Regions:
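N-terminal polar alpha-helical/low-complexity "assembly arms" that mediate subunit docking
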Residues: 1-130, 135-139, 255-326
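Carbohydrate-recognition loop of C-type lectin domains
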Residues: 125-275
């Protein structure tokens, strides 16, 4: 799937500079006035009028730029993105429904723009009738707004030659296969599709309920290829601990620096929380080495966290202490 962030800026979006527009207005004015106007002073009322015209032109072109970007999937936001997604037959999911009767009233919590944008792009995969990985991922993500990530895998088998005496006891035309890769499934069979699902961190829906919801959606006759058997499981946490000593430069408040380092680390861990996610030791160092930190002595983890398609990184404890450089 194309990474939208790597696309060049669209030519329809114009680069705007006030001075360029002002010089254009000034050129048009001079072409009409000829030598009859020479009072080119900043304080001249005519100059002020031309500056206003150039500014208004700048605003109009900026509005055109915004409208052009709102029509593109890579840049659209909010209601513009919802309308763009509707062109693909995709609707924004509701995470928490509104409760107007509550005191105070509770607004609905909706799917975020980036999640909707991602599903919209995946929706093209759903047009495949061959059961592509992208199609399974799209249908799984669309089954519940509680999900943030889905991985798709399948077991692999190879044929085995058997002795003639054994073959004679098998049904006519039977073949014998062995499983070379189980894709995390118990007793895998040809045609199995292994899916792992990961819920958002604040989800209150039981994992078993999410698994059942996804399995029901993927088993629909208009979704599942007749030769496939989807099998869904919850993501498996790959637990790790973070323990580090942060050496704070003389001057800054150690508590303030510690809070900044903790926030940076939390962000890095949250970004790695996905199936098949990774959190290298270098990423932990980078997250902790914020402004005001002179050195980081990392005790744990000793090795980076590397997950397979059914695992995701999960920090079970974080211990950060500070020492001031003297």
């Amino acid at each position: 799937m194309i990474d939208l962030s790597l696309l060049p800026p669209p030519d329809v979006v114009e680069t705007l500079e006030f001075e360029t527009l002002y010089q254009e207005v000034l050129g048009i004015f001079r072409a009409h006035m000829g030598d009859q106007w020479t009072a080119l002073l900043e304080s001249d009322p005519v100059v002020k009028l031309m500056e206003v015209m150039a500014y208004r032109e700048l605003m109009v072109r900026a509005r055109i730029n915004a409208a052009a970007k709102a029509s593109l999937l890579a840049y659209a936001k909010g209601a513009d993105l919802e309308n763009r997604a509707a062109d693909y037959g995709v609707q924004k999911l509701t995470i928490r429904p509104a409760n107007p009767d509550a005191v105070p009233p509770v607004e609905a919590v909706m799917e975020g723009d980036e999640a909707l944008r991602y599903r919209t792009r995946l929706s093209l995969e759903a047009l495949s009738v061959a059961g592509s990985s992208g199609a399974y991922e799209y249908h799984a993500l669309s089954s519940s707004a509680e999900l943030v990530h889905v991985s798709v895998d399948s077991p692999r088998f190879s044929g085995v030659a058997v002795p003639a005496a054994v073959k004679a006891q098998l049904p006519a035309g039977a073949i014998v296969v062995v499983c070379d890769y189980d894709a995390g499934l118990a007793n895998p069979l040809p045609g199995d599709v292994s899916l792992a699902v990961l819920a958002r961190p604040d989800s209150v829906v039981p994992e078993a309920q999410l698994v059942a919801t996804v399995l029901k959606a993927l088993s629909a006759e208009d979704v599942r290829p007749v030769t496939d058997r989807p099998r869904v499981q919850g993501g498996i946490p790959s637990d790790f601990q973070v323990e580090a000593v942060l050496w704070v430069e003389a001057g800054p408040d150690p508590d303030v620096v510690l809070a900044g380092a903790r926030a940076s680390l939390d962000k890095a861990i949250a970004g790695a929380r996905r199936l098949e996610g990774q959190l290298p030791v270098s990423a932990v160092y980078a997250a902790l080495h914020v402004t005001g930190i002179s050195r980081v002595d990392l005790v744990k983890p000793v090795e980076g966290v590397v997950c397979d398609k059914r695992q995701y990184p999960r920090a079970t404890s974080i211990s950060l202490t500070t020492k001031v450089v003297t």
